[in-house]
A protein has these predicted regions:
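Long beta-strand-rich cores associated with HINT superfamily self-processing modules
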Residues: 1-109
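Intrinsically disordered, low-complexity acidic/polar and Pro/Ser/Thr-rich regulatory regions
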Residues: 106-118
Length: 118
């Protein structure tokens, strides 16, 4: 479903992709998975430079609920400096990331099977 959402975003006439990074196919060493887009959006509003229509820039991160939960935990660990056993936590986060990715694939397979019957 992530790639369907990415394709939909790319099809929008007022959205231009500036940069994209696929951390689902190119998983980070710590297990992080997500799809990042830097986009330019043309909107019928004046931008900070006074252009109308205006051009606005945004980052869009597309990921599953499981990926988002993992990213939130990893973010907390990264910025909390008084953690005991950080090596163990990093190892466990990587293991969880791999398990969540396998679960995401299984859930997508189930969804595809359900949709194939309709």
């Amino acid at each position: 479903d992530i790639y369907k959402n990415i394709d939909y975003l790319k099809s929008l006439p007022n959205l231009k992709i500036i940069k994209e990074k696929d951390y689902i196919k190119n998983v980070k060493p710590n297990g992080y998975r997500s799809y990042h887009l830097i986009v330019e959006i043309t909107a019928p509003y004046e931008d900070i430079l006074g252009n109308n229509p205006g051009k606005f820039f945004a980052e869009i991160q597309v990921r599953t609920i499981a990926m988002d939960s993992w990213a939130s935990l990893e973010h907390q660990m990264k910025y909390k400096h008084d953690i005991k056993n950080p090596e163990l936590i990093v190892k466990e986060l990587k293991r969880c990331a791999d398990e969540l990715a396998a679960c995401d694939v299984s859930m997508q397979t189930i969804r595809n099977l359900i949709n194939a019957e309709n």
